[in-house]
Amino acid sequence: MKIPEMNKVYVLNPHYHLRHDIHRVALFSSTGTDTDCSRNWHTFIHPLQAVMLSFFTYDRPLQTTLPLLCDFFCRSKEEMIKWVSDFIDNPTPIYTSSQQGEIYFPKRILIEAEKAGKALRFDRLQANSFVWKKLDLTTRRLYSGPLLLTFMLTNQCVTHCKYCYADTSTQIKSPLTTQRMMELIKEASDLQVQQVNLIGGEIFLHKDWKIILKELVKRGIAPEFISTKMPVTQKLLQDVQETGYQGIVQISL
């Protein structure tokens, strides 16, 4: 066991998020997570484990955090150091055992604040925000709502591929307004979804695709990739770049 340095600030890796799911807590990664973290991660953890991680969402050194953990969990300093150390800069995913099976955690769960770079944030999560009554670590479907959403911006397309399942012939009489889409994006962000996928038709044929994508990027829930058949032009590339999108643009043939 590697003993952590008491004078350093350790934080919950900003590429990971905790979402209370009534009977457990969802631990998931952001889209666009770098290779030093576990990409496309989603597991359920015990609420008490989420509480422990919540103590590392503040700007304070371990020597300040440790007594707080000891008081909350009624454990000695030695016990808490042993527990916490396994989660600090772990190079590979780890797991703990419970009566409902193994609980998995991604790599580098807790990291030094100075190594978080521009992504560093202090969410200041409250321990009492993970209260639960009946533990359930096995049900796959989330209790609090979906983790992934998909918006079909338009069913219009620039091609007519025989293998495509999309209905591109039906004329949509009352499409969602851009304002309503922005409201839905805010709701999705408030719900703490992992990402919102964009599909078509051809999403770049929607008149306000740039506004929609930019808002998803701003809220950290942009799709991991966008598929298109649009002829790539300098203007299109510039527009995508201006949204701040850092994901993959897949050119389908």
Question: Where do the model's predicted regions map?
Answer:
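Hydrophobic beta-strand residues in large extracellular and virion-surface proteins
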Residues: 18, 27, 52, 84, ...
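Hydrophobic packing positions characteristic
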Residues: 1-19
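Residue-level recognition of the GNAT/N-acetyltransferase active site
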Residues: 57, 154, 206
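Long, charge-rich, low-complexity alpha-helical segments
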Residues: 41-148
